[in-house]
Amino acid sequence: MPRRYLALLLLWLAPQVHAEALYRVELILFRHATPLEASQHAPYDWARQARPLERRAERQPALEHIAARLTPEQGYQVLLHRAWQQPVSDDGPATAIHQGQRHFEHYPIQGTLKLRPGRYMQTDMTFWVNRFGGYGQLLASERLTQRVRLVPGRLTYIDHDSLGLLIELRRL
């Protein structure tokens, strides 16, 4: 009888242990071709239901040696390079990331990243590179949208039209 309760307790606790794993996320968003603007602008509610990346979660990037090689002389322009730690769970919210001066509801670089745990981390990402007019109005957007499976500990390259993204996840 006690073994049955122990087994039930272990089954009940097992998903919770797996559900709150802490990961270090690092990404480099860069341009590798002439901007290819999307037919639609970034939506005003681009970060809907996403949790903003908190300053206290940010970490010093470890892939600076790679970002340093993405130079204009080589045909690249680094747009965003961030590193942070976050818990990853099945029902956790997406993380909203942005960079630059805010213009109404938008930033020059903005996006969301959602991670789901597993041997291969299911990752949904959407990033916009926005261009603004003289009065701060949104004129055009480039968009990178991907759903990929990532292997923790492996640097992954995502190619999309005029933009590219390098992302690495490490379990802490």
Segments (PLM) and residue ranges:
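Contiguous hydrophobic segments
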Residues: M1, R59-H65, G164-L166
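N-terminal signal peptide c-region/cleavage motif recognized by signal peptidases
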Residues: A14-Q16
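Short beta-strand-to-coil "C-cap" segments at the C-terminal boundary of structured domains/repeats
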Residues: H32, E168-L172
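Sec-dependent signal peptide recognition
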Residues: P2-L8
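Extended, low-hydrophobicity segments enriched in charged/polar residues
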Residues: A19-R149, T156-I158
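Short, surface-exposed beta-edge/turn micro-motifs
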Residues: R24, L163-G164
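Short, exposed beta-strand-loop hairpins at the edges of beta-sheets
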Residues: R154-H160, L166-E168
